[in-house]
Amino acid sequence: MKVKPILSALGSLLVLSAGGPSHLTAGEPGKDAPNILFVAIDDFNDWGPTQLDGAPFEVDTPNFDALADRGILFTNAHCNAPSCNPSRTSIMSGLHPASTGVYANGHDWLANERFDDILLLPEYFQQHGYTTLGGGKIYHANQGNDFNRKGLLSPRGWADFFPSFEEQLPVPSMPDIKPDHGEGNFNWGGTGKPLEDMGDHKVVNWAIDQLETPQDKPLFLAVGIYRPHMPWF
């Protein structure tokens, strides 16, 4: 398998529109409806793009700069919660955790009836004539110590999802040695595996394939990057 470099991959994901909002009616995308790329990155610090002032690190981020130049840059965006599940549920529903009732990673929002009548982000685009594709960590993923589960992925609004609706994340390569102190579920260290075995590479390569596939409708593509969540990679 030929590895597609992660920086080149990110550089290829430049489809955000900087145009004004389209006034759409359900099921009918506007004539100039843009393709929309939604990228979620876990545990990401405020590195770049360089258009942002006050970053604590001086890091060159040419691909983020390119995204900012060709897309929409929010300079005053904030996270509604400091943990994964309430934050991602808030983003995908458009509601504050005080409204969703999701305050912790263990809260199963899929079992909450209040979401039955809430329009989720991919549902909105699907109802307005978009092809909606998702892959990787979009909703909160891991439950307990099981890294091969769909987590809290909702199938609502997606035409397709990678790897599948039953497995939100590709199974990650992890060190084989377990901690000897009885806590945690993996040891610190490298895996000895090639980059193409890493879940994020699989997700990004899948996303590039979708971008290279001709679409007969505007595309909403959600790409969830799991790293740098883990400290060892």
Show which residues each predicted segment covers.
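Formylglycine-dependent sulfatase
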Residues: 6-14, 19-233
